[in-house]
Amino acid sequence: DPIASHSATIVTTPVFEQQMAWLAAHRYRVVPLREVVAATLGNAPPIEGPAVAITADDGWRSVYTQMFPVIRREHLPVTLFINPPMISAGSAYLTWEMIAEMRASGLVDIEAHTQTHPNFNTERARRTPEAYAAYLTQQIGGSREALQARFGVAADLLAWPFGIHDAQLEAAARQGGFVAAFALGSRAAEPGGDPFAIPRYQVYETDIGARFAAVAEGFPRGRGVVQASSSRPIPSSTPRKAAISP
């Protein structure tokens, strides 16, 4: 995929493996994202550092073909934020069968990333206030309903497309049944923070060696949510792509 091969948000599999090896060598624990949510909400004690949670957005197929073998081998919990209508919609995306296999491993949690990954700033500008409110219900609440219908379990975590969120969007997420939502922000998730704007560090292909150490050690008290950038499939002749989430 020529677009993927030039994307700044791609992390190749060898680099992802190096990053995970650095965390292991420096005694970082990779914890399930729900532990971060529980600590943020005050429903559990603060996470003892150093620790990180890993997320990946968008549901690209390379998460299954490239990333999943690594997380299964290393037994790493990962949360995927997906857009339900895009699944099984083409060769670039995960299929529901792939997702079922990953969920069955007990390592992969599937959560919502809205229905179609909209830019909410753009969509607000092109709609009346009433139409925009209805659109939010469809995009936000609809994504949770689709995942709950598919898996029969609560899918109550949300990742904001492009990291865009505001008071109206957060209210729509609450009304849609979500308990927490994730943005960007390159800072640590802290107990008592806004549960609908939990920050994530975005990690890049260039974050290796000293650069990755600087990112990891910059987490206040060694805690952070790492967002694996979305990745797309690429020709087998080029380095394999994977993504990790801060």
Q: What feature does the model see in each segment?
A:
Residues D1-V52, E217-P246:
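N-terminal pre-catalytic segment of deacetylase/amide-hydrolase enzymes
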Residues D1-S7, H26-R29, P45-V52, W60-R61, ...:
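Metal-dependent polysaccharide deacetylase catalytic core of the NodB/CE4 family, i.e.
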Residues G185-V215:
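A cross-kingdom marker for long, charged
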Residues G176-G185:
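Catalytic-core region of carbohydrate-active enzymes that cleave or remodel glycosidic bonds
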